[in-house]
Amino acid sequence: SKDSYPVTKFHSLVVPKRCIKNYFELNDKEILACDDLIKKLQQKISLEDSTVKGFNVGTNSGKVAGQSIFHCHIHVIPRREGDVENPQGGVRSVIPSKQHYIRKK
């Protein structure tokens, strides 16, 4: 389904049918089904929009992690060149003070 407050165009949600609070309550079969759907979404979005060059895939599990809807859902967020000034660090940006790091060679 589409996110009600999309971060980018085609920001989508994978929502399991079973009513559970978060990703960690999914069983193995549900995880595989979600993963399959995530891959299909990635392919569909990439074919539909050639400006998409990457994806963020993630879930918020628990109030302190930013979860506000307590039914498991997984975000699939298409990314494009220039949608942020510096994408380095990716999901590390959830804690702003930790988003900058030095790569060890």
Regions found by a protein language model. Give the residues of each.
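HIT superfamily nucleotide-processing domains
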Residues: 1-105
